[in-house]
């Protein structure tokens, strides 16, 4: 179980990217929204 916590925490060298890593899982949702807006713009052809 401790290995899971070790893997969940970024190494110290990458701590500056910690806020970025928190945002990364949301990116596919933006692509889904973009696809919907694109289809709405072309009239769902």
Swiss-Prot record:
It comes from the Bacteria. It is found in: Cellular thylakoid membrane. The keyword GTP-binding does not apply. Pfam families: PsbK. The chain crosses the membrane at residues 24-44. Residues 1-8 form a propeptide. Keywords: Membrane, Photosynthesis, Photosystem II, Reaction center, Thylakoid, Transmembrane, Transmembrane helix. It is a single-pass membrane protein. One of its GO terms (cellular component) is plasma membrane-derived thylakoid membrane. GO terms for biological process: photosynthesis. Signal peptide: none annotated. The keyword Transmembrane applies. Its main location: membrane. One of the components of the core complex of photosystem II (PSII). PSII is a light-driven water:plastoquinone oxidoreductase that uses light energy to abstract electrons from H(2)O, generating O(2) and a proton gradient subsequently used for ATP formation. It consists of a core antenna complex that captures photons, and an electron transfer chain that converts photonic excitation into a charge separation. PSII is composed of 1 copy each of membrane proteins PsbA, PsbB, PsbC, PsbD, PsbE, PsbF, PsbH, PsbI, PsbJ, PsbK, PsbL, PsbM, PsbT, PsbX, PsbY, PsbZ, Psb30/Ycf12, peripheral proteins PsbO, CyanoQ (PsbQ), PsbU, PsbV and a large number of cofactors. It forms dimeric complexes. Belongs to the PsbK family. This is Photosystem II reaction center protein K. It comes from Crocosphaera subtropica (strain ATCC 51142 / BH68).
